[in-house]
Amino acid sequence: MAYKSILVHADLSRHAPQRIAIAARLAHAHQAHLIGAAMTGVSRFYVENNRGMRGGAVAAQISALHGQAEQALDQFETLARQAGAFSLERRLIEDDEDGGMAVSARYSDLTVLSQHDDSEALPGAMSDLVPYVMLNAARPVLIVPRSGQFAHVDNAVVVAWDGSMEATRAIGYALPLLRAARLVVLALLHPPAGHAQPARHPGADIATYLSRHGVPVEVRPAVATDDIGAALLAMAAEVHANLLVMGGYGHARFREILLGGVTETVLRQMTLPVLMAH
């Protein structure tokens, strides 16, 4: 596959500039159309304030919500052009963050979000944004950590491989980045319960598949531990990786988010950008 359309969350968070810059550099490198999406949160505002506010107060609040979204899109446009994106689109969405980003992500090849930051409580910010989009969009999500600076995400890459459908999808979605990488390390994990064991040497088939796509890999067993998420992050640090690719495990019912242990660990403790697909 190729990235032809990249979506990035535009808001007024202190993490927005780095998120937008990474998305714009990827759009430039892959000659992709870049969409900045800002949510007004008007739908949630109506639900939470459907009684007790007079018409004038409602209109003023809605105007303020629109103003904040437009300000976020102004920042997106400025930063994206500075980073070299050549095809830009501003998208103002009358919805909350979770629903607005999940629906828009379905029509993009890659969505760029930031890791949740408990220390920054913006009005309308959703703590479950990343897992919600990952579990409801049927598209890959690139998550940028809340700490650190990341100039590149396609130099050295660690790929978590356990033979699962989620890991297979993540690799397929990451191919444009893997082809550009200097180093790709395949971290072998034990297959999830209920999955068939590989007939050949673990990792041989997926390594062959990747080599046919022009991606030579170095196969390594992950450290034997109960904390696989921490082991993956440790391996990424060891090889100086700037991207981790992995399947996102979890279940989404209504607005309840149920995540697998490895996914939850990585989303909470990530130290480098992570591409996840469910």
Give the ranges of each region predicted by the language model.
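A structural preference for short, hydrophobic beta-strand core positions in alpha/beta folds
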Residues: 36, 89-92, 143, 186, ...
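Generic structural signal for helix capping and beta-alpha/helix-loop junctions
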Residues: 44, 97-98, 120, 151, ...
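Amphipathic coiled-coil/heptad-repeat helices and related helical stalk/stem segments
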Residues: 19, 97, 126, 167-170, ...
